[in-house]
Design a protein with these regions (language model features):
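Hydrophobic helical h-region of N-terminal Sec-dependent signal peptides
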Residues: 8-16
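N-terminal catalytic scaffold of extracellular/periplasmic and nuclease hydrolases
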Residues: 22-192, 198-216
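Gly-rich Lys/Arg/Thr-decorated short loops/hinges at beta-loop-alpha junctions or inter-strand turns
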Residues: 106-114, 226-237, 272-278
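Sec/Tat signal peptide C-region and signal peptidase I cleavage site
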Residues: 17-21
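Bacterial N-terminal signal peptides that target proteins for export
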Residues: 1-8
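Active-site His/acidic residue clusters
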Residues: 151-157, 231-234, 251, 256-285
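A Trp-anchored, charged/polar loop motif used as the substrate-binding/catalytic surface
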Residues: 208-212, 241-256
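Acidic-aromatic/histidine active-site loop/patch
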Residues: 185-200, 221-224, 230-237
Length: 285
């Protein structure tokens, strides 16, 4: 009996040590040496909205927003928003969602299974905001800092029951109807197991395929451009700087020529990665 009690006490001690070790992490701090300026924006009055820009911070929660607000001395461009709400994006078959299921909820308004991309719970494709824009005669585009086979961009342009079927997802882009695309992931567009060359298929559809930043920023013909200058993700924040902002502005410039307007999804894709890695400094950059 004494031995059993000793074993139980030892086991409890190990549990306590293990639990405390999980929270025995070094404190991280981050502050912008030079806070960026934030201006007050006034919405134009008396004009009908024709352009829609959806900006997604991958994996971003209210805590991320508050942390950024603190790091920038209590100022964020986000505070110019005239309304605040919460989007509940749980998966239909799992409490904790992922960018496949959660992003599909944002892109289509339809809840779906964990890891599903652009499909309902039965695996049937559902129309996204890209499709809605095209039906209205608008242009549609996406700009991301991740691989274009990653879940969020695919939620708007592709359809599959499993986000891990990366080559299959990339194979959906030529038929997606999206006009402007910027992101990484070139390695799965050519030299594929199925023998398809997605870049050539895009060219056959009338896209200008851009494989370098110089070519991308110099292009000025129309909005049908598929820019994939990187084999995988775009570079880390310190290296890429304001690349996402500049790429997004390029898309806006090209698609704004459509008199009926445009829809654009812009994703800060790498926030999620640094959240997983618990890297506060990279998360804030």
């Amino acid at each position: 009996m004494k031995i059993k009690k000793a074993l139980v006490i030892a086991a409890l001690a190990l549990c306590v040590q293990s639990a405390s070790a999980q929270y025995n992490m070094p404190t991280q701090t981050f502050t912008y040496d030079k806070p960026y300026a934030v201006e007050k924006i006034k919405a134009p009055k008396g004009k009908k909205v024709k352009n829609v820009i959806l900006m997604i911070g991958d994996g971003m929660s209210l805590m991320h927003v508050y942390t950024a607000w603190t790091a920038n001395r209590g100022k964020l461009w986000l505070e110019n928003a005239t309304a605040t709400g919460l989007s509940k994006t749980w998966a239909t078959n799992k409490l904790v969602t992922d960018s496949g299921s959660g992003g599909t909820s944002l892109a289509t308004g339809v809840k779906t299974n964990y890891h599903a991309v652009g499909v309902d719970t039965e695996g049937k494709p559902v129309p996204s905001l890209v499709d809605v824009a095209k039906e209205l005669g608008k242009d549609a585009g996406i700009a991301v800092t991740c691989r274009l086979w990653d879940a969020t961009p695919c939620d708007f342009c592709c359809h599959n029951i499993d986000r891990d079927k990366e080559e299959e997802l990339v194979g959906d882009y030529p038929a997606s109807g999206v006009n402007f695309v910027f992101g990484g992931g070139a390695e799965k567009f050519a030299n594929r197991k199925d023998g398809r060359d997605i870049f050539n298929e895009l060219r056959a559809k009338g896209y200008h395929v851009s494989r370098s930043l110089d070519d991308f920023f110099a292009y000025d013909t129309n909005s049908n451009i598929f820019a994939v200058p990187y084999d995988k993700d775009t570079p880390l924040p310190d290296e890429r700087g304001d690349l996402l902002a500049r790429a997004s502005m390029k898309g806006i410039e090209l698609m704004n020529r459509n008199k009926k307007g445009f829809f654009m999804m812009i994703e800060g894709s790498q926030l999620d990665d640094y959240g997983h890695f618990n890297q506060l400094d990279m998360l804030m950059k």
